[in-house]
């Protein structure tokens, strides 16, 4: 980014610190878009690629947030040294992880112990607890995103009451928030400013998709010998950028960082390019690499939620006239 911005034909110059800030805001990926596209095509993934992509997407959001905040502080305060940056990272990580663990345990206990007559209030209670977790962690100078992520992992992997109602509510709320975010972010964009950074943004986007993402994926997966080459190639391709990078790009704008408007426009442009190029080709690449499987049809559970400790399941079956004729009545 810094090298490209120094070219005379770009008419754009970003200092090394601002270039790092731009890279930090773009480091978050969105696996939810990948799975939404696959579900629309009635496809699933082999080799447990889904949990790997979910882990990556969920874990890189807190890190992208920390990098963005620390780099903004570094740019605004020239006296901030490497030691202060490292200390800020450690404090945010430790406080965020500890708060997420403790409050996640508290959320599990609260959901299972409280007896609310109206079961529709359980998802509302958990949503309020999410905001509480983020707020109290941020008040303690920790990473609120990391705390919410860890608390969510704990709640999702423990036995809780009304799990299905909570999941359905949160899934719908996720889509609603994504629609609102893209609508609000679209209102912040000026088309003529997008044209000014189009060439540089396109080159950065191509570099990220073709070189940066595959290189980082292959380096990170080197210790995992059992992951096939096709799986590595697919993970390299599906590094979609969603609304989160655009949200992080608004932080420099709010902080009045030099070149912040340019950062926002570049991030927005790259996100749109990523969604168009990678988003439209996810299912094609999965089929090309023979990593797609038909989406398993789930039966009708008739609105009944069985406790997890009961080793049984509900299934539905269509009764035909031939079956009735052959039955012993």
Which sequence ranges carry the predicted segments?
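Cytosolic regulatory domains of K+ homeostasis systems
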Residues: 292-329
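Transmembrane helical cores of multi-pass secondary ion antiporters/exchangers
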Residues: 1-295
């Amino acid at each position: 980014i810094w090298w490209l911005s120094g070219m005379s034909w770009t008419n754009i110059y970003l200092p090394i610190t601002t270039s790092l800030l731009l890279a930090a805001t773009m480091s978050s990926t969105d696996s939810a878009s990948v799975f939404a596209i696959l579900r629309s095509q009635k496809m699933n993934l082999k080799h447990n690629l889904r949990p790997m992509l979910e882990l990556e997407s969920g874990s890189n959001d807190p890190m992208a947030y920390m990098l963005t905040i620390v780099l903004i502080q570094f740019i605004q305060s020239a006296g901030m040294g490497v030691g202060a940056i490292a200390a800020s990272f450690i404090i945010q990580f430790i406080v965020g992880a500890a708060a997420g663990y403790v409050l996640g345990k508290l959320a599990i206990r609260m959901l299972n112990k409280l007896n609310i007559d109206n079961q529709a209030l359980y998802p509302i209670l958990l949503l309020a607890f999410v905001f509480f977790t983020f707020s109290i962690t941020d008040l303690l100078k920790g990473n609120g995103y990391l705390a919410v992520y860890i608390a969510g992992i704990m709640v999702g992997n423990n036995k809780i009451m009304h799990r299905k109602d909570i999941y359905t509510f949160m899934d719908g709320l996720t889509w609603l928030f994504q629609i609102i975010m893209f609508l609000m972010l679209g209102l912040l964009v000026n088309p003529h400013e997008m044209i000014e950074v189009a060439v540089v943004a396109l080159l950065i986007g191509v570099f990220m998709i073709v070189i940066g993402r595959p290189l980082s994926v292959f380096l990170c997966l080197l210790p995992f010998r059992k992951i096939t080459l096709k799986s590595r190639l697919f993970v390299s391709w599906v590094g979609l950028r969603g609304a989160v990078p655009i949200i992080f790009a608004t932080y420099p704008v709010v902080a009045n960082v030099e070149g912040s408007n340019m950062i926002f426009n570049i991030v927005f442009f790259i996100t749109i390019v990523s969604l168009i190029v990678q988003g439209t080709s996810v299912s094609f690449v999965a089929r090309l690499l023979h990593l797609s499987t038909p989406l398993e049809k789930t039966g009708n559970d008739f609105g009944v939620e069985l406790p997890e400790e009961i080793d049984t399941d509900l299934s539905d079956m269509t009764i035909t006239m031939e079956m009735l004729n052959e039955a012993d009545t």
